[in-house]
């Protein structure tokens, strides 16, 4: 059995310098001061981290938005947090839209997290593939700079083509796709959607996958996507790992543990969700079989 932990959307935030407020960060900082700083709290993340570590998962996937304004100081803070939860070989990271908040931030993930965003082939490009026991982790990046009031993501043709190749090359493994933006968003979330989500879904229909993990929505969710053949693909979302229950608009902080075993055509996968309640206690809140 292989145990995989999934958490997302830490939103580690520092105060931008005055010179940095002329960009999109200025509007983001106003929003942070008005409400988001009350939601995303380091003490909540610390509690979630301690609880997660006690579960002794074999691998941890972090699906983006580790930072809030994509400041170098936030990246360094996130790096220290990553080092606290595991070795780079045991932790896989992808960026989210907040990690590429403004132009110029695209280079920061490789600068600060290079050994956490590198595949088994040693190359720093997306998607990258990490094989761990019977699981093949296929990591994508949807983080692109966007204008004010936008939180969209994009994969692009090159990344989609490489994804198709990776899914084909890892056929027979428990292929787990890591992505920040969900592959399917309701119309009301137009400004937060994955722009080429339909293209991603077409690749998944053509090549198949066993599991897709995402963040972005700050909600615990499960959506079944069309896959290759008769079996559908579970797309599982997770809440923000730092969301304080009292002020969270969506679900309070939590994470998931996946227990995976079996072989191609005979997989078994159980998901257990943990959540930090209003009283500060972290407990199991859901358990279900995907396979």
Which residue ranges define each predicted feature?
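Beta-strand-turn-beta hairpins that frame and shape the catalytic cleft
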Residues: 1-5, 16, 129-139, 168-174, ...
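N-terminal active-site segment of His-dependent metallophosphoesterases
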Residues: 1-75, 83
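Active-site neighborhood of phospho(di)ester-bond hydrolases with catalytic His/Asp-centered motifs
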Residues: 6-8, 59-65, 91-97, 141, ...
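Active-site environment of divalent metal-dependent phosphoester hydrolases
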Residues: 11-14, 68-71, 97-105, 145-149, ...
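Extended active-site neighborhood of metal-dependent phosphoesterases/phosphodiesterases
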Residues: 72, 76-162, 202, 229-231, ...
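Short acidic, glycine-rich surface-loop motifs adjacent to enzyme active sites
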Residues: 170-186
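Conserved beta-sheet core of the metallophosphoesterase superfamily
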Residues: 189-264
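A short C-terminal boundary segment appended to hydrolase-like catalytic domains
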Residues: 260-291
